[in-house]
């Protein structure tokens, strides 16, 4: 959620910090601030509530000296409102040190009372200032930033990433993480810290991901990682697979428009190198050995939001192909209901960032109960893959818009690959069936391109409906999670009421919502796959149309049965039915984006939302 940047190097810290925070805006925030060690050795800070532009305007009107060491932060409020005072950094040791923080310090009230009893004072409502004041006290006792920092983080409870600097040690930044992201960037004569690699990818693509309960100290020439007890830790470097230009708009009106246009490539890149001779072979999973998968007797997919809907789509395919029971659980509900877990349970987690706190906690809970774990993730160096037996990366590229589009189709494609790989190992599909499925799957990217060609028609529809106050979405089978995702996108981007339903539930309550003019999107299944299911959906369309609904059908090319009953029909190319979600979701994404644009809303940074939810 919060964005964090740290830098030690040459006298360009303002450039690095502000540029890094700009690339972390997608994480969601309501205030921003920086702290810099000035050339004269003093600590200079600036922070403001509001967007990053407010901070940059402040710096233009009231400049602070540049320097070679600094930390920067974008805040998503948890403790205390979005005010200048509550914005980070927070100061300690009489303004000689600065701290920034992502996460929640659960025992901050106890620590605050302890410090108040010693007559320390506080200016903000935040838990972060407690850490800053505590660090100032410990620094005075220890005389060393690293030693004081180690003492402080060992006392903190909760999930957090913490960065600090002190003017007495002007070429040092220290950081720590527990259940919250922190990545190191390795430069020449300079080093970086960030919530993710986007913070520093403009300057270096060489990175290190530190583990749980670890502390990092960076100077211009050195990076040191220890555990919370001070013992040295070896960390493996990795290379970021994309450069800074991939996280820029490149002439598009919004990141969301750009990322929707990139969906064919997102799917193609996820599939690339993972099939041979008509069968799926995923190197990351094959390395675990067949026995790992043959021992599975149930699969539980854990995820939140859009990722959970990707999991629902994937569950239909995995269960059909591999003949293993598959359930999909919301991560934040999973571990609180005492689920039945055994050594035969495989947990498949889905998280674009690999840092979603609820999903991370679900994976840890399942692992402690004896489950195996695989993660589907789009971000190198993330925490959840490191907590799993293996990671299946989607290679969708950086997704900057807060509401997910290309990561969603990448996740579905990855789950299809996993299902086909599992079926091959378990022998539940013939060689011919595997070849046919692989061929159909690898044909999807070009079919997505064909759907994108109808974007102008969909945009026109959205602009016509810009005063709509409520929209319903219906689907059956794999169309049901697409209906859920279509409704979520509209809520996220256009701030209007939208609900997704299984079409079979219509007569069990939701039909009461139908009134004249009510817009209803219907994801129509292919009649080539199940004529019975197709007829039922057409019947549902007739039922709502009879009550005055305005029906927008998403149907495959050549399906004439919907024409007499739909007000508008958006066509998608013919595809194997299980793969249709990768096509039918595209018009719904475009519609939600264009409706938000018609209302004059920010489609990249919707209100109140964060890209990566790193607190529970």
UniProtKB/Swiss-Prot annotation:
Membrane-spanning residues where? none
Which keywords does UniProt give here? Aminotransferase, Cytoplasm, Glutamine amidotransferase, Repeat, Transferase
GO MF terms listed in the record are:
carbohydrate derivative binding; glutamine-fructose-6-phosphate transaminase (isomerizing) activity
Q: Where is the SIS domain?
A: 288-428, 461-606
Which EC class is the enzyme in? transferase
Q: Does the keyword rRNA processing apply?
A: no
Q: Does the keyword ATP-binding apply?
A: no
Tell me its EC number(s), please.
Answer: 2.6.1.16
Any GO BP: fructose 6-phosphate metabolic process
Cellular component GO terms held in the UniProt record: cytosol
From the UniProt record, list the reaction(s) this protein catalyses: D-fructose 6-phosphate + L-glutamine = D-glucosamine 6-phosphate + L-glutamate
Annotated Glutamine amidotransferase type-2 domain residues: 2-221
Q: What is this protein called?
A: Glutamine--fructose-6-phosphate aminotransferase [isomerizing]
Organism phylogeny: Bacteria, Bacillati, Actinomycetota, Actinomycetes, Micrococcales
Q: Which gene encodes it?
A: glmS
């Amino acid at each position: 959620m919060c964005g964090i940047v740290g830098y030690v190097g040459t006298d360009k810290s303002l450039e690095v910090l502000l540029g890094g925070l700009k690339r972390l805006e997608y994480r969601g925030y309501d205030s921003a601030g920086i702290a810099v060690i000035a050339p004269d050795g003093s600590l200079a800070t600036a922070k403001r509530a509001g967007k990053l532009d407010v901070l940059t305007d402040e710096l233009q009107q009231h400049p602070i000296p540049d320097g070679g060491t600094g930390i920067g932060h974008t805040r998503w409020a948890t403790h205390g409102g979005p005010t200048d005072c509550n914005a980070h950094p927070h100061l300690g040791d009489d303004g000689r040190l600065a701290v920034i923080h992502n996460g929640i310090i659960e025992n901050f009230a106890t620590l605050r009372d302890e410090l108040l009893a010693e007559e320390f004072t506080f200016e903000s409502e935040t838990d972060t200032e407690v850490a800053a004041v505590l660090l100032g006290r410990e620094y005075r006792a220890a005389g060393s930033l690293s030693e004081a920092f180690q003492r402080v983080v060992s006392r903190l409870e909760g999930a957090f990433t913490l960065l600090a600097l002190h003017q007495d040690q002007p070429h040092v930044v220290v950081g720590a993480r527990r259940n919250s992201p922190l990545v190191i960037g390795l430069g020449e004569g300079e080093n970086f810290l960030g919530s993710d690699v986007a913070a520093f990818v403009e300057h270096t693509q060489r990175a290190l991901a530190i583990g749980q309960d670890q502390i990092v100290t960076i100077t211009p020439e050195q990076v040191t990682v220890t555990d919370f007890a001070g013992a040295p830790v070896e960390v493996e470097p990795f290379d970021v697979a994309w450069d800074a230009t991939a996280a820029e708009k490149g002439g598009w009106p919004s990141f969301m428009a750009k990322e929707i246009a990139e969906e064919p490539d997102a799917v193609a890149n996820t599939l690339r190198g993972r099939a041979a001779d008509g069968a799926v072979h995923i190197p990351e999973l094959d390395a675990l050995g067949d026995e790992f998968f043959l021992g599975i007797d149930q699969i539980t997919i854990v995820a939140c939001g859009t990722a959970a809907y990707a999991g629902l789509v994937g569950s239909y395919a995995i269960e059909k192909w591999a003949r293993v029971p598959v359930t999909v659980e919301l991560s934040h509900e999973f571990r609180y209901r005492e689920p039945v877990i055994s050594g035969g349970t495989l947990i498949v987690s889905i998280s674009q960032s690999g840092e979603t706190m609820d999903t991370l906690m679900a994976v840890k809970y399942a692992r402690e109960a004896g489950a195996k774990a695989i993660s589907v993730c789009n971000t190198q160096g993330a925490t959840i893959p490191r907590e799993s037996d293996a990671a299946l990366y989607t290679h969708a590229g950086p997704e900057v818009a807060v509401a997910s589009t290309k990561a969603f189709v990448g996740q579905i494609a990855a789950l299809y690959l996993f299902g086909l790989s599992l079926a091959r190992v378990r022998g539940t599909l013939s060689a011919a069936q595997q070849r046919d499925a692989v061929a159909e799957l690898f044909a999807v990217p070009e079919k997505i391109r064909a759907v994108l060609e109808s974007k102008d028609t969909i945009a026109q529809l959205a602009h016509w409906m810009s005063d709509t106050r409520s929209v319903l979405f219906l689907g059956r089978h794999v169309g049901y999670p697409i209906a859920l995702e279509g409704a979520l996108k509209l809520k996220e981007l256009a701030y209007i009421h939208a609900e997704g339903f299984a079409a079979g539930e219509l007569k069990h309550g939701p039909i009461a919502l139908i009134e004249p003019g009510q817009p209803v999107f219907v994801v129509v299944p292919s009649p080539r796959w199940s004529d019975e299911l197709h007829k039922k959906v057409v019947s549902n369309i007739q039922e709502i149309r009879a009550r005055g609904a305005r029906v927008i059908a998403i149907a495959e090319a050549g399906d004439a049965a919907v024409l007499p009953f739909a007000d508008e029909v958006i066509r998608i190319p013919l595809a194997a039915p299980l793969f249709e979600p990768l096509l039918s979701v595209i018009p719904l994404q475009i519609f939600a984006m264009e409706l938000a644009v018609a209302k004059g809303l920010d489609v990249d940074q919707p209100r109140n939302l964060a890209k990566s939810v790193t607190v529970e």
